[in-house]
From Swiss-Prot:
Species in which this protein is naturally found: Aspergillus niger (strain ATCC MYA-4892 / CBS 513.88 / FGSC A1513)
Compartmental location: Nucleus, Nucleolus
Listed name of the protein: Nucleolar protein 9
GO cellular component: 90S preribosome; nucleolus; preribosome, small subunit precursor
Residue numbers spanned by region Disordered: 1-53, 163-182, 466-507
InterPro entries: ARM-like, ARM-type_fold, NOP9, Pumilio_RNA-bd_rpt
Pumilio repeat intervals: 96-131, 132-168, 196-231, 335-370, 371-407, 535-575, 577-614
Family, as annotated: Belongs to the NOP9 family.
Domain of life: Eukaryota
Job description of the protein: RNA-binding nucleolar protein required for pre-rRNA processing. Involved in production of 18S rRNA and assembly of small ribosomal subunit.
Matches recorded under Pfam families: PUF_NOP9
Gene this chain is encoded by: nop9
Basic and acidic residues biased stretches: 11-41
Amino acid sequence: MPREKVKRGRRATEKANKEASKRKRDDAPEDVVPKRVKPSDDETNDFGAQTGDMPFYGLLDPEEQEYFSRANEVLETNQFGDAEERRVFVESVYKEAEGKELKISCSQSCSRLMEKLISMSDIHQIRRLFSKFIGHFLHLVQHRFASHCCETLFIHAAPGVSQKPSKKASKTEAEEGDEPEPELSLAEMFMKVIEELEGNWGYLLTERFASHTIRVLLLVLAGEPVDLSLSDSVVASRKKERHGVLNEVQDENPVAQKRSVPESFEGTLKKIMQDMVSVLDDTYLRALATHPVGNPVLQVLVYLELSHFGKASAKDPKSIIRRLIPDDTFEEGTESTVFIRGLLYDPVGSRLLETIVRYMPGKLFKGLYKNFLRDQLRSLSRNITAGYVVLKVLERLGKDDLENAVELLVPQIPNLIERSRVIVPKTLVERCIVRGVDTTPIARSLETAYDSDPAKRLSQMLTLEDTTTTSEPQQQNQAQDQDDHQQPPAIPDFGPDNANANINTNPKGAKLHNSLFVQTILTAPGPLSALVYSSLLSQTPESLLTIAKDPTASHVIQKSLTLPTSTPQFRRQFAVRFTGHLEELALDSSGSRVVDALWHATKDVFFVKERMAQELARSEMALRDSFVGRAVWRNWSMDLYKRRRGEWAAKAKGLDVGGEGGQKPKSRIELARERFAAKAAESEKKKNGEDA
């Protein structure tokens, strides 16, 4: 008889039991409670604090996504006839988005539309949208896409915090059937946001997305400017995209100005700042200084404490600046010097140190400079990261200390120029001009740093030669630079430090910095600017054309023709070098600006300007066929030159005072109206006198 296959049967039985149990689990009813979403890296902060479950607000339908995508394209092009047409379109998008605001804000494809929509909204639309977000801010500020919408909302709501809601407007909208105005004012809405975020400041400091919004919120409460496009903004990096109307004038931009805020904001701001740092001990607070996410928030806290609450706050032992820098003697080996030394060479921490140096009280800064930074100024200026701290130090020095700093840094200038690090020499020249310090030692140092031949000197200063490859001596200098200072032992090999090194060795970046350095030199009177002026006069016509058509280097020629340090003798000799090449320059995007500068440079040499106008008139057809050529034709008033030569000559000689001052000259009919109005006012005054 064949043997019973027990093994196979046992395995088959076990398999059948497993499948049966699996079917039972599949047939079991689902839980009423929704499943927890697995937390991603974005839902926990860098210190591991759990931020809770992110609510799901739903998805947009395909038709809705298509509509909002088209609306985004319309707002992106911004080709509206007038402001009223844009307002009507924005209002129609708001009506379509009613009830879907949270979905749009959390949508990867449509959150950018919400940002543009907010930036083009009036204060009533912002208040209505703000009221829809209330109750959800704790989750929205931590969302990858919605956090940007919250940030934009805070920025554009800031100018209206001092306004009260209009009951008349609310009643009118109710009669017209529009969405009614919310009862809360913007100031009260901001207080609601504070209530929602209360108790969570500790981990929001280092939350990847919320930290940006928290920084904006702090500045709104303080009444400080919240414009992200400002070069010295502490809110966001300069890469941050700016939405809104492109032709908005900076002076008319309310987010770029300081604002008056309700009195309750100041007390709330103090409490928030205390709550943020009270849960951290001193060691943990100093660790934030080198934290990539926490550092920018700490910068804002230090900035507000030192600039908004006055110098007295720096004396409080519980203040942030005192907890970071407890000793004001800055003796070697103290907590303060150890902390500052660690920040100097750290690519993240040095940003905080720049803010501290810029806003710390004068007495505290003098102690820091004289007891710690002054002796290290040379080695700090050679370092890529610490060099930016040196810039802030130079900006705060008085005349006597600046003269001493010039003596310390002048021997380092040739070494810095060889390594294409001209930011320190550039700032040194700027501060010498402001403080009235003699720049002759800097001029002598530059003479040794560059070639003695004036023609070659300018080529070296503007890096017009091929700099696509880094020479072996430069690589040796860069390697040697790492040993020029005592760095802390733990310096990461990633992040902004490497980025700074790449910028430093980037030929385009070096060329831009060198051009700015030469332009700064031109603003200094005396032998320093004479180095550049003599080099310009030594150039051949071919090299001048090359410089004039270079997008970066051409600014040097423009400045040399228009700055106050440019003498009439130099302009008379230099301007004639471009005759015979005006058509070529006028048809070039960079060269056309040089031709525009020649108009102002030849105001005291009329015969040169007239000869240039004749040359441009001979090239009329070519100039009119070119966009930049038409701009040159207009800026030189060539139509006036062809039709009314006498008026053009008066304008060319600077006799047209109204046009020279930047104001449009009044026409004859306007002058006649003014005379008529003056006579009418005089007769009215006489009549009133007779009646009396």
